[in-house]
Amino acid sequence: MAFLALGINHKTASVDVRERVAFTPEQLVEALQQLCRLTDSREAAILSTCNRSELYIEQDQLSADIVLRWLADYHHLSLDELRASAYVHEDDAAVRHMMRVASGLDSLVLGEPQILGQMKSAYAVAREAGTIGPLLGRLFQATFNAAKQVRTDTAIGENPVSVAFAAVSLAKQIFSDLQRSQALLIGAGETITLVARHLHELGVKRIVVANRTLERASLLAEQFGAHAVLLSDIPAELVRSDIVISSTASQLPILGKGAVESALKLRKHKPIFMVDIAVPRDIEPEVGELDDVYLYSVDDLHEVVAENLKSRQGAAQAAEEMVSVGADDFMVRLRELAAVDVLKAYRQQSERLRDEELQKALRLLANGGNAEDVLGQLARGLTNKLLHAPSVQLKKLSAEGRLDALAMAQELFALEGSPDSFSDKKPQ
């Protein structure tokens, strides 16, 4: 039994590398099944977000190199390139890492709540793929409990901060009066929903939601009095938009330099503020070369995020302590489980010996045997049978000079004295 947590995140890899190592939702089930099949992993789950791609694995023997090689091959990267950005956590450290991630302690925005939902989605997909078993299943449940405790018992979730909030904060810095600004939001997922909520609360003049399907865009738009359009309508909406924030699951860019350049001409070069939160990127990096465009990627949000971290450092320290306790408790319970099969077998063996001696005693009583004598014989017979196998093994270990094993037996049977005291005795 061994746990692995390995992958890359916003702290170790550039957005370019994260794009190439990201898994699409459609890939996950097949990728999980292939991962288990090709790396001798008994259980596995994959967490893939715009800021991280991580594998959580349970194996008989740790083989991080094999898993890293699989990840590199799957995404057509060189192993050296992946190693340069990857991290590996094993056993206790892997458990602690998972709990830190789910609690928002390892996020770009400290304490952001979305990561717990993403972790739950990773668990659900792994169950669908059939790659979650009893051990990873227990670890995920312990992880969810730890994250819930952190969220409930610390102030880390107060004054909610997220990548979405950071994007809107940047917009506020550039446009002094958002109530006169128009915003185009591309996508209709959780991040864009948060962006829409923040912009709506700030009284942005007009919000447009563009999505691949009009139905999904409309569902989001209705919540905030926004307008819904298709992706094909983006060029027309760009002309009217002062703020563009994009976060889709598209594998290809949604916005190119040419389209933005055309919109700027029609806007008479009135500036456009753009934030690309997606991985892979929705907006071609070359768009940032245009004079009247302020283009930010997720990696550019670090400065904004840093300001919001200050108020959360005290809460983070308390959260770290909770995570450490949760991880330690989980590993203790897990190691206790390792003894269950041995204890079960020992109990079954003891009950079989008890039943044999009991049947013998009942036969003696049925034949008129003295009850006191029969009970004494039952007690002696049961004692001898229960002690026979341990006695044989202890004598063998003693003959081999295995004082460590004798000390363990002494602890196991709660005996007084030290096995060392016998080592100085010489035969008479």
Curated annotation (Swiss-Prot):
Domain notes: Possesses an unusual extended V-shaped dimeric structure with each monomer consisting of three distinct domains arranged along a curved 'spinal' alpha-helix. The N-terminal catalytic domain specifically recognizes the glutamate moiety of the substrate. The second domain is the NADPH-binding domain, and the third C-terminal domain is responsible for dimerization.
Catalytic activity: (S)-4-amino-5-oxopentanoate + tRNA(Glu) + NADP(+) = L-glutamyl-tRNA(Glu) + NADPH + H(+)
GO biological process, one term: protoporphyrinogen IX biosynthetic process from glutamate
Superkingdom field: Bacteria
The keyword Oxidoreductase is annotated on this UniProt entry: yes
Binding sites annotated in the UniProt record for substrate: 49-52, 107, 112-114, 118
Pfam families per UniProt: GlutR_dimer (PF00745), GlutR_N (PF05201), Shikimate_DH (PF01488)
This protein's UniProt keywords: NADP, Oxidoreductase, Porphyrin biosynthesis
Functional summary from the UniProt entry: Catalyzes the NADPH-dependent reduction of glutamyl-tRNA(Glu) to glutamate 1-semialdehyde (GSA).
E.C. number(s) listed in UniProt: 1.2.1.70
Top-rank EC class of the record's enzyme: oxidoreductase
NCBIfam families reported in the protein's UniProt record: hemA
Protein name as annotated: Glutamyl-tRNA reductase
Catalytic site positions: 50 (nucleophile)
Site (described: Important for activity): 97
Organism this protein belongs to: Pseudomonas fluorescens (strain Pf0-1)
GO molecular function, one term: NADP binding
Family membership noted in the UniProt record: Belongs to the glutamyl-tRNA reductase family.
